[in-house]
Amino acid sequence: MSKKKVLVWLSGGVDSAVSAYLLKEQGYDVSAGFMINYITDDDSCPTRVDMAVAREVAAYLDIPFFTFDFIEEYEKRVLKYIFEGYKQWLTPNPDVFCNTWIKFDLFREEALSYGYDAVATGHYAQIRTNNDGLSLLRGVDPEKDQSYFLSALSREQLSQAMFPIGHLPKSEVREIARKAGLPNAERKDSQGLCFVGKVN
């Protein structure tokens, strides 16, 4: 029986790195994917650094590493929408749209087209199967719960998603990273608009 193939979105952060590590330890056929959604020539957007760290993590875990260029799609689907909202004094949440339209739409579709069964991320959320289908639950760490940012996902999207650290507190995720020797175990959590960095 073949192993379930999972494409993990590696962001360069510790959460996605531990997610990839745990899935590999559990026997899944794991690969890593890095999404390029925005890039600049200055230091305002850390895409190049994040990609280098993600690549280093994948090499350490001895798993394949792929990059996906979604710059054009991200600008059309997310950036224009949220910046128009800002102009109207609205505060659309970029992470909700990014998760719905990029990570669990474009990235998921790419994964499926290459023969993967599911995509995984380092979100602090959980998925439960019940009589009505699938339900999105909060992560066990109340300070890190990210279920709100995933609240617009469809059941189809959830059926092909995995959140390997949703049942863990952040402190335990850090400890797993340290014990596993992950190269980004002490890296600080990212800040700023999804994939863009600081916006004035």
Residue ranges and their predicted role:
Residues M1-A152, M162, K170-V173:
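ATP-dependent adenylation/nucleotidyltransferase module used to activate substrates
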Residues A152-N200:
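Internal nucleotide-binding/catalytic subdomain
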